[in-house]
Amino acid sequence: MFKNYIEITKPGIIIGNSTLITGGFLFASRHAAFNYVLFIYTILGASLVIASACVFNNLIDIDIDKKMKRTSNRVLSKKLLPVFSVFNFAIFLGVLGLSILGCLVNFISMSLAVFGFFIYVVLYTMFYKRRSFYSTFIGSFSGSTPSVIGYTAVSNTIDICSILLFVIVIFWQMSHFYSISIMRIKDYREAKIPVFSVVKGVAITKKHIFFYVLNFSFFSSLFTFLGYLSYNFLLLSSIVNFYWSFLSYSNIKKNNDKKNARKLFYFSIIVIVFFNFLISIDVFF
């Protein structure tokens, strides 16, 4: 049973978001001493809130998950846990996480966690996901908050740098999840989820992926031109971003949609990990 409770928190998503939190935290720490205790509180608090949001997502999407091959074996789809207990578990995780952020980190980081939670659970999961192809865009605002939570945990302020970081991760989210929408288009059609690739078609989706990759690359470079990061960051990130742009542009003209979307999906993970690595270590260049 313990394993089932862990599974509904979606550990993979928590780990992925921890990368964003860590990148934002280290980025903001570039001109200050690294606070290990604050870092632990930030990771723990934010991860608990993310886990809570994921559990609520599982609860709300039970009917959808049963229809999709990829999710039909999830814990709640197979009724391995009582819904009431899962609901209480989600509340417990959320309250504990927000308490840690509010009491041991700062009010801004806690507020951002509330913002991200609301966007993901209420706007995305409960409303837009079932009704509009804009759901991915709405959800990307939630997916971008971990970076800023990490940043503001140190800075205790929302500045131009944190806003730029937020925007950059939105562009990454869009390209990343549009690739998923092509990979899993059959599942989304069967579950009647109006993702962009289903509503507008794969051809247009591939063009949009390229558009978002270009924007990610451009806005990333602004960190250097605005004086936040070094030219070493610009050089190294540009190499990776150029190849990502090449892949996404080539994908427009290729026919094997799922294969190429999968390639873009995996490379986008490399991109965001490398990006966070670079902003974390740039102070040493």
UniProtKB/Swiss-Prot annotation:
It is a multi-pass membrane protein. Its main location: membrane. The chain crosses the membrane at residues 8-28, 36-56, 80-100, 107-127, 133-153, 163-183, 209-229, 232-252, 265-285. Pathway: Porphyrin-containing compound metabolism; heme O biosynthesis; heme O from protoheme: step 1/1. Keywords: Cell membrane, Heme biosynthesis, Membrane, Transferase, Transmembrane, Transmembrane helix. GO terms for biological process: heme O biosynthetic process. Gene3D superfamilies: UbiA prenyltransferase (1.10.357.140). It catalyses: heme b + (2E,6E)-farnesyl diphosphate + H2O = Fe(II)-heme o + diphosphate. It comes from the Bacteria. GO terms for cellular component: plasma membrane. This is Protoheme IX farnesyltransferase. It comes from Buchnera aphidicola subsp. Acyrthosiphon pisum (strain APS) (Acyrthosiphon pisum symbiotic bacterium).
